[in-house]
Amino acid sequence: RKQGIDVVIIDEVSKSSFLDLLIPILYGKTVILVGDHRQLPPMYDLRHMRDGDFEGLDENIITKKKNDLYTALYEECFFKTLYERVPDDFRVMLNKQYRCHSHIMEVFNHFYGGNERGLMIGKKQQDDEKQHGLTVKVNGNIIIDPEHHIYFVDCEKKESSEDGSTSKQNKQEASVIMELLNGIDRAALELISKGKIRVDKERQIDERPSVGVICTYGDQAGLIKKRRKGIQYKGFSQKDDEKLIISTVDDFQGDERDIILVSMVRNPRDHRFNAEFVKQFERINV
C-alpha cells in the first residue's frame, strides 16, 4: 500500500461512479480509463427521486441538495465528466469497431455522431467474417436471410404487469422471441448437417453461433426464461462463455453474442407512459 502502482488501467469504466474509481486512481501514478460514456452509467436505486418527487419526505433525512449530491457520487458517469472536460491531448476516441456487421453499425452510429463522424469498420473483410449465413423460417415463411443483419419485428399486443410488480412484460413479444430462437436453432442445425458450420468435440472445434436475448425489463427476461426451460438448442454454441443468455440490458452490458434478440416490452394500452429508463439512449445503445 505504501508503494504506488506505475500504471492503473480501469476497463468498462462507464458504469463506475466517482467513489468506485477513487481508490484505484489514488494508487496509480498513471491512470488509464477505458470505457464508453454513451453506454449505461452507474445504477441508482432511489428511482422515485429521479422525477424530483420529494413530497412527504423528512427533509432532515433526504433533501433535494443531498439527493443531488448522492446522484453526483453514485449515478453520474465520472468518466463522461472527465472525458468532456480534459484537454484533447489527454483523451482519444477509438473509432474502429471489430464486433459487428456494418448493417448493425449504421444503426448505433447515430449515437456516435452519424456514419460520417462515428465508428467505422475495423477490417475490410469484416463484413464477410460477420456473415451469419442463416435462413430462418417460421411457419414456412423466410423471415431472416443471409443478406441482412438487422431486423425489426412489430408486435401489436399490449404490455402487462404481474400483481405486485412494478416491472413489465409483453407475452406476445415473448412468444415471438421463442419462435425466433427455435427458427435460428433449426437453421443452424441445417448448416451443421451440410458441413457449413463445423462442430468437432475431439478437435475442440465449435463454430455454432452464440445467441443472447436482451430485455428492457426483468419480468420479461423471467418470462422468457420460464418458457425456454427444458429446451435444448443444439444449434447454439455450447462454449462456457457463449451459451444462450437471457438477461436485462443492465446485466448484459460488456458481454457479447453473435446473434442478439432484443425485447423492448413497452406498448401501453393508453399510449402514454413514463418510461424514463427506456428513453435513455445509453440503454438502447447497449
Region locations from a protein language model:
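Conserved helicase motor core of SF1/SF2 NTP-dependent helicases
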Residues: K2-V286
